[in-house]
């Protein structure tokens, strides 16, 4: 019987690649996506397309309305998404307060209910936006919490957080996505709320630069 892995699936390139790595490892993969009031709702359609293309065993989307209290340019429509690069040491306005902490908690809940051995995350701390909840020390601390706070953890067989991309460059992620036949054209990385990638937000810029470096400029937004 194959192992089960829960994949947090945003619809973006990173989470799709992480899910594909779990599938390559022979795991039964269950996708979990979140409608949290993000302005870029297009990513939810992308998540569904990716789940189907990768042949995930199940795919769930749940509502977690983080826009109710805002605090991020990804949820507050009156707050513009920045179109300049990330400054060193500055956490950008696209950081959503507590987002990964909430999402991982829900992923662990699903994992324990399904008897999943792993929860795979597409977080990346290298070529990304400096978010505090995408770093190895954060994940290590969360693993300790999960082991203490769950029945399975107390019994010695708790769900393990798996972040295979956390220290990869964006170019390496693109190269792995190509190797794994991830449907890159179906993924969505843009922070803006339009029907087409803006090409100027931080997420678009990082993605496009990596695609060009990996020899696939045809998949870039512009």
Swiss-Prot record:
* Gene3D superfamilies noted in UniProt: HUPs
Q: Which Pfam families match?
A: QueC (PF06508)
Q: In which pathway does it act?
A: Purine metabolism; 7-cyano-7-deazaguanine biosynthesis
A molecular function (GO) held by this record is:
ATP binding
Q: Enumerate the catalysed reactions.
A: 7-carboxy-7-deazaguanine + NH4(+) + ATP = 7-cyano-7-deazaguanine + ADP + phosphate + H2O + H(+)
Which parts of the sequence bind Zn(2+)? Answer: 190, 198, 201, 204
Q: Which domain of life is it from?
A: Bacteria
Asked whether the keyword RNA-binding is assigned, the reply is no
Disulphide bridges: none
Q: Which residues bind ATP?
A: 9-19
Q: Which UniProt keywords apply?
A: ATP-binding, Ligase, Metal-binding, Nucleotide-binding, Queuosine biosynthesis, Zinc
Any binding details for the cofactor? Binds 1 zinc ion per subunit.
EC number(s): the record gives 6.3.4.20
Q: Which family does it belong to?
A: Belongs to the QueC family.
Q: In UniProt terms, what function does this protein have? A: Catalyzes the ATP-dependent conversion of 7-carboxy-7-deazaguanine (CDG) to 7-cyano-7-deazaguanine (preQ(0)).
Note the HAMAP family from the entry.
Answer: QueC (MF_01633)
Can you say what this protein is called?
A: 7-cyano-7-deazaguanine synthase
The species this protein was found in: Synechococcus sp. (strain RCC307)
């Amino acid at each position: 019987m194959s192992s089960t892995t829960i994949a947090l699936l945003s619809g973006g390139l990173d989470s799709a690649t992480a899910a594909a790595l779990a599938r390559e490892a022979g795991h039964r993969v269950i996708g979990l996506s979140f409608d949290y009031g993000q302005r870029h709702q297009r990513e939810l359609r992308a998540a569904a397309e990716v789940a189907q293309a990768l042949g995930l065993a199940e795919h769930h989307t749940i509502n977690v309305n983080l826009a109710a209290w805002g605090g991020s340019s990804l949820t507050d429509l009156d707050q513009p998404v920045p179109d300049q690069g990330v400054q060193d040491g500055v956490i950008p306005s696209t950081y959503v307060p507590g987002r990964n902490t909430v999402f991982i908690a829900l992923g662990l809940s699903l994992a324990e209910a399904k008897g999943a051995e792993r929860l795979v995350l597409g977080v990346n701390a290298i070529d990304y936006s400096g978010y505090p909840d995408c770093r190895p020390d954060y994940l290590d601390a969360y693993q300790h919490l999960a082991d203490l706070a769950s029945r399975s953890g107390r019994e010695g067989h708790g769900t393990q957080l798996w972040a295979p991309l956390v220290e990869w460059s964006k170019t390496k992620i693109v190269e792995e996505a190509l190797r794994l036949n991830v449907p890159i054209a179906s993924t969505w990385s843009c922070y803006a709320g339009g029907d087409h990638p803006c090409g100027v937000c931080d997420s678009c810029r990082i993605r496009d630069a990596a695609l060009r470096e990996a020899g696939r400029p045809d998949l870039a937004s512009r």
